[in-house]
């Protein structure tokens, strides 16, 4: 096939009238974002998911949710698995607000410690607590009680 015969193909996702677009999600994390947002498969909302879409910086995921704006707690959880994500609020088909997620230096009650012997996993009324660091691509959590580190599959340990 000659270069003249090649066609540029685009992946097109219909724009949303009102809602949220979460862009620049780390490739492969879109389904964890849906888990964080607790969107059931039986939802009447239109949800569009792009996984491993080409990007200037490699690959990314994108999630579009019609008719819903995220709360602060949801955005904070998304930041743990997608530290470079942007949250775009769409109103009347236009971006009305655009924010970059921010990772807090400490989180409480958001992630379960992976150490089964940690005090936060006992029957005691102790809330999980982690120190958070990030290098831009990877988030690292250190339990404040047992100092166990979580850096892989953080989405699997969200409460």
UniProtKB/Swiss-Prot annotation:
GO terms for cellular component: aspartate carbamoyltransferase complex. Pfam families: PyrI, PyrI_C. SUPFAM superfamilies: Aspartate carbamoyltransferase, Regulatory-chain, C-terminal domain, Aspartate carbamoyltransferase, Regulatory-chain, N-terminal domain. The keyword Metal-binding applies. Zn(2+) binds at residues 113, 118, 143, 146. GO terms for biological process: 'de novo' pyrimidine nucleobase biosynthetic process; pyrimidine nucleotide biosynthetic process. The keyword Transit peptide does not apply. Binds 1 zinc ion per subunit. InterPro entries: Asp_carbamoyltransf_reg_N (IPR020545), Asp_carbamoylTrfase_reg (IPR002801), Asp_carbamoyltrfase_reg_C (IPR020542), Asp_carbatrfase_reg_C_sf (IPR036792), Asp_carbatrfase_reg_N_sf (IPR036793). Its cofactor is Zn(2+). GO terms for molecular function: metal ion binding. Keywords: Metal-binding, Pyrimidine biosynthesis, Zinc. Belongs to the PyrI family. NCBIfam families: ATCase_reg. PANTHER family: ASPARTATE CARBAMOYLTRANSFERASE REGULATORY CHAIN. Contains catalytic and regulatory chains. Involved in allosteric regulation of aspartate carbamoyltransferase. This is Aspartate carbamoyltransferase regulatory chain. It comes from Methanococcoides burtonii (strain DSM 6242 / NBRC 107633 / OCM 468 / ACE-M).
């Amino acid at each position: 096939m000659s270069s003249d015969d090649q066609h540029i193909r685009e992946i097109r996702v219909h724009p949303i009238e009102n809602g949220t677009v979460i862009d620049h999600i780390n490739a492969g994390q879109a389904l964890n974002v849906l888990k964080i947002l607790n969107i059931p498969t039986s939802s009447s909302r239109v949800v569009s998911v792009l996984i491993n879409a080409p990007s200037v910086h490699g690959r990314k995921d994108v999630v579009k949710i019609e008719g819903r704006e995220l709360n602060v707690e949801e955005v904070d959880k998304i930041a743990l698995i997608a530290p470079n994500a942007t949250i775009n609020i769409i109103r009347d088909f236009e971006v009305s607000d655009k924010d970059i997620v921010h990772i807090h230096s400490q989180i409480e009650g958001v992630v379960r410690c992976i150490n089964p012997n940690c005090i936060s996993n006992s029957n005691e009324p102790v809330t999980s607590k982690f120190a958070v660091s990030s290098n831009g691509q990877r988030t690292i959590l250190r339990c404040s009680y047992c100092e166990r580190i979580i850096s892989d599959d953080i989405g699997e340990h969200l409460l």
